[in-house]
Amino acid sequence: GVNKIFPPQKQVLKNIYLSFFYGAKIGIIGLNGSGKSTLLKIIAGIDKDYQGEVVFSPGYSVGYLEQDPKLEPGKTVKEIVQEGVQEIVDTLKEYEEVNERFGDPEVLEDPDKMDALINRQAELQDKIDATDAWNLDSRLERAMDALRCPPEDQVVDTLSGGERRRVALCRLLLQQ
């Protein structure tokens, strides 16, 4: 079982065993200070300072949405949501950069550099196709609409607490 002790000797979790059926909706209730948030942080992998073992079935992923999510000031709603698919965003950006380099005289004059660039472009193209990255904007828009996020160009500094949580949830759900 999982155990958690806070210094000096406050045990909030003692010999906890949990199993969830596929598709089950789970609620965790308890008094203040009883370990609800601690348990969720352990399950999500945020808190690693505990005794015992947490095991997941293959293919499952776990996310954790804080009560007051941290959103980088100055960013727009869309920029925050894109953080959930940052690897795809970075791949698309690199693909654009590679394509721009095809016009570079240094590349045009060196067959080895041209071959390397063509190979990199092919690798990126495969990755883009495999992740359906060409449709990323419509996926983001659908996700933001489904969660009733504020307009994508709104700066997160001006959002209410509920709006901030919806934006953070959208980012979390888009993560792989």
What are these regions (language model features)?
Residues 1-176:
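ABC ATP-binding cassette signature C-motif
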